[in-house]
């Protein structure tokens, strides 16, 4: 279940560093640490020092040292104390101090990139406590280095194009999402609580996903589930019942060893009602029109324009209130973003989530969402679970 070093990825990062004359990049966001080293941090306290030349250095809390040595692509893995008998400060402060020492030791203090504008990040493996930055983090590197620049947008730019290994890992996450949805489709019943459907999906994916095909070490699913009149743009899963003859909508994120899906799938106990048949047909046409525009060289904003124009023509002007296109990879939401006012074109190797939605006043509606790999001649849908869930 160990992936070989992704040399194509490292070459892309180093080409970026060459263009921006960087000695090193410091990564703390768990998704950037994963991207650069293949180590998915357990607590989010760890740091990666990625030099333009030579082996990266990974700094991890002591209990994770052996795990990091096993999974990281780089050989230089060091630990800092998670608990120190003479130092009551939080362990992430020790990580920063150690990183500064490494920069000085390796003579990497001339021009360094740090994550100055990291607005979001993947969760760590324990999920519950997202790590954050603090002023001392920035001050420490600014004091130690002659010059620091913002590496967050530079890494985001590199990450937009997936390597073959990344695509393989995203396929596994999408396969697990389909397995979870098929399990829910076959076992959901009218009257069951939305939360029961959510638990069914999340538990099944975790049970099947850990060890899946001998390739996945950790798999988790995160869902929001709404049924019938409970369907809205974004609200919490509740104890509302699954409604017969109406869709139960599942916003489903699956993470397989740090690579994500962002999907919206549906199921319906029994046959779909007449009004929902009409809505589904409308939304499928809008969805397919948007998918048809996805190919290398197309404007990123086309997805947004086509979806909103189609929803307006269907009689729902101004909908939806949420974005309808974005990148997916080591985060469920990452650049590029498909926005009608934004520049940029689609490129082969991008993976885009496309998600049109129509919502009724007072409750109810429908959303479809899949992840698509952009190719020279079109795109490939990564999840096999059908969008026309009547079949």
Where are these regions (language model features)?
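Active-site neighborhoods and metal-handling regions in enzymes and metal-associated proteins
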Residues: 1-391
């Amino acid at each position: 279940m160990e992936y070989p070093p992704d040399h194509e990825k490292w070459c892309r990062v180093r080409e970026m560093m060459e263009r921006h004359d960087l000695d090193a990049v410091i990564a703390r966001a768990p998704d950037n640490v994963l991207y650069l080293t293949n180590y998915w941090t357990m607590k989010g306290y760890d740091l990666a020092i990625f030099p333009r030349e030579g082996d990266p250095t990974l700094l991890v809390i002591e209990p994770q040292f052996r795990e990091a040595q096993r999974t990281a692509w780089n050989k230089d893995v060091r630990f800092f104390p998670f608990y120190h008998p003479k130092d009551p400060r939080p362990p992430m402060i020790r990580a920063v101090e150690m990183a500064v020492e490494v920069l000085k030791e390796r003579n990497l203090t001339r021009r360094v990139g740090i994550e100055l504008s990291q607005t979001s990040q993947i969760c760590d493996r324990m999920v519950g406590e997202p790590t954050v930055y603090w002023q001392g983090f920035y001050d420490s590197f600014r004091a130690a280095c002659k010059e620091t620049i913002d590496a967050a947008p530079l890494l985001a730019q590199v990450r937009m194009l997936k390597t073959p290994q990344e695509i393989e890992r995203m396929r596994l996450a999408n396969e697990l999402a389909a397995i979870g949805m098929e399990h829910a489709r076959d076992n959901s019943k009218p009257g069951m609580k939305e939360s029961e459907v959510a638990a069914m999906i999340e538990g099944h994916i975790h049970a099947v996903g850990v060890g899946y095909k001998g390739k996945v070490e950790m798999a988790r699913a995160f869902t929001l589930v709404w049924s019938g009149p409970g369907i809205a743009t974004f609200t919490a899963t509740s104890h509302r019942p699954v409604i017969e003859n109406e869709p139960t909508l599942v916003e489903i994120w699956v993470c397989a060893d740090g690579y994500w899906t962002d999907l919206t799938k549906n199921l319906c106990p029994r046959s779909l009602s007449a009004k929902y048949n009409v809505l589904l047909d409308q939304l499928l046409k809008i969805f397919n029109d948007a998918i048809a525009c996805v190919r290398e060289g197309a404007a990123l904003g086309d997805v947004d324009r086509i979806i909103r124009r189609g929803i307006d023509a269907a009689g729902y002007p101004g909908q939806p209130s949420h974005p309808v296109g974005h990148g997916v990879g080591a985060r469920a939401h990452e650049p590029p973003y498909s926005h009608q006012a934004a520049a940029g074109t689609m490129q082969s190797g991008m993976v885009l989530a496309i998600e049109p939605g129509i919502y009724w006043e007072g409750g109810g509606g429908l959303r479809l969402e899949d992840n698509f790999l952009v190719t020279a001649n079109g795109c490939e849908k990564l999840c096999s679970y059908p969008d026309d869930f009547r079949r």
